[in-house]
């Protein structure tokens, strides 16, 4: 269990909130998180790369020149892998890169990753509450009030972000918005700072408790 200080949107302290999640043992946590990240990145790959072998590439039916008498190496086809425009040996073919990981392990890895970032985490009581219409500058100013530096990658975790907040954050290169029930290990570890809405903390503990 850990206790986070809660900040208001204007940057002032407003109280405290607790985050209590079960994590993996210290001896196995690194391996667990590594496998979770590897799986996530592998499953994003399209696997559509494809090349032609010598049997698939066009042409090559006739012998390019006679077997003997030219002084050159013998060739049986213009589509041999040894010639430009020839087939590819052991080139890529469409395949699936998907890796399996059972649900309990995935959730344990996510909880462990989240709790490992407690020192970089800030709880925000009313993130973007003053926004009436999409305005990127208001979000940038708000992040500065919360102690976020310009060059830091930030993951904003909210329970149910409004369209106004989504559109306001969308133009900021190093800020990513994610719903509390759609967390993933890579984004948690990739960010320099994590901003979590107070209601999102309740949602996280409800969804990922076990």
Swiss-Prot record:
SUPFAM superfamilies: Ribosomal protein L4 (SSF52166)
MF term (GO), any: structural constituent of ribosome
Pfam families reported in the protein's UniProt record: Ribosomal_L4
Assigned GO CC terms: ribonucleoprotein complex; ribosome
Region feature Disordered, mapped onto this chain: 46-89
Record's subunit section: Part of the 50S ribosomal subunit.
This protein's name: Large ribosomal subunit protein uL4
Family membership noted in the UniProt record: Belongs to the universal ribosomal protein uL4 family.
Biased composition (Basic residues): 60-71
Keyword Ribonucleoprotein part of the UniProt annotation: yes
Record GO biological process: translation
InterPro entries hit by this protein: Ribosomal_uL4 (IPR002136), Ribosomal_uL4-like (IPR013005), Ribosomal_uL4_dom_sf (IPR023574)
Role this protein plays: One of the primary rRNA binding proteins, this protein initially binds near the 5'-end of the 23S rRNA. It is important during the early stages of 50S assembly. It makes multiple contacts with different domains of the 23S rRNA in the assembled 50S subunit and ribosome. Forms part of the polypeptide exit tunnel.
Gene name, Swiss-Prot/TrEMBL: rplD
HAMAP family: Ribosomal_uL4_B
Swiss-Prot/TrEMBL keywords: Ribonucleoprotein, Ribosomal protein, RNA-binding, rRNA-binding
Domain of life: Bacteria
